[in-house]
Amino acid sequence: MGGISIWQLLIIAVIVVLLFGTNKLRTLGSDLGASIKGFKKAIGDDNQPQQAQKTSSDADFETKNITEKQSVAQSETSESKNKEQV
């Protein structure tokens, strides 16, 4: 009863379109979208340095080469086979 119904919103929308026209409303919509996009980009730029700091504060791990492990494992198995044969 006290709220705005869908019919009242439709009447307001028709009046706004008649007053401003579709071209003006389209321009306002694109300007509003561009400003929101710029705002989100500015907020996102502030968050990126914080994320970079988080990744740089992680523990340092040595990089391991898988091929070295395989060659070491193969050499160890061949040495153990040689010992068994002796």
Curated annotation (Swiss-Prot):
Role this protein plays: Part of the twin-arginine translocation (Tat) system that transports large folded proteins containing a characteristic twin-arginine motif in their signal peptide across membranes. TatA could form the protein-conducting channel of the Tat system.
GN (gene name): tatA
Family stated for the protein in its record: Belongs to the TatA/E family.
Stretches for region Disordered: 42-86
Transmembrane regions: 1-21
Cellular compartment(s): Cell inner membrane
Protein name as annotated: Sec-independent protein translocase protein TatA
Matches recorded under NCBIfam families: PRK01614.1, tatAE
Top-level taxon in the UniProt lineage: Bacteria
Assigned keywords, A-Z: Cell inner membrane, Cell membrane, Membrane, Protein transport, Translocation, Transmembrane, Transmembrane helix, Transport
Biased composition (Polar residues): 47-58, 68-77
Quaternary assembly: The Tat system comprises two distinct complexes: a TatABC complex, containing multiple copies of TatA, TatB and TatC subunits, and a separate TatA complex, containing only TatA subunits. Substrates initially bind to the TatABC complex, which probably triggers association of the separate TatA complex to form the active translocon.
Coiled-coil ranges from the UniProt annotation: none
Record has Cell membrane as a keyword: yes
A GO biological-process term: protein transport by the Tat complex
UniProt membrane topology term: Single-pass membrane protein
GO cellular component annotations of the record: TAT protein transport complex
